[in-house]
Amino acid sequence: MFTTKKSLLLLFFLGTINLSLCQEERNAEEERRDGDDEGGVEVQKRFFPFLLGALGSLLPKIFGK
């Protein structure tokens, strides 16, 4: 009986550690995915003002003739 309890306790302990490691890995993946989305938004924010500035300088030259 004592060895059975010991075995079950060991299995429970190892299962808990395994579950904890899987959850940490999942959280790390979600953070990486979230980080990519934020980077894409920042690139868009930097790109549009540049595009508007370029169009603002080109349009008067094109239609000014």
Curated annotation (Swiss-Prot):
One of its GO terms (cellular component) is extracellular region. Expressed by the skin glands. GO terms for biological process: defense response to Gram-positive bacterium; hemolysis in another organism. Keywords: Amidation, Amphibian defense peptide, Antibiotic, Antimicrobial, Cleavage on pair of basic residues, Cytolysis, Hemolysis, Secreted, Signal. Antimicrobial peptide. Active against a variety of Gram-positive bacterial strains. Not active against Gram-negative bacteria and against fungi. Shows hemolytic activity against human erythrocytes. Belongs to the frog skin active peptide (FSAP) family. Temporin subfamily. This is Temporin-SN1. The lineage of its organism: Eukaryota, Metazoa, Chordata, Craniata, Vertebrata.
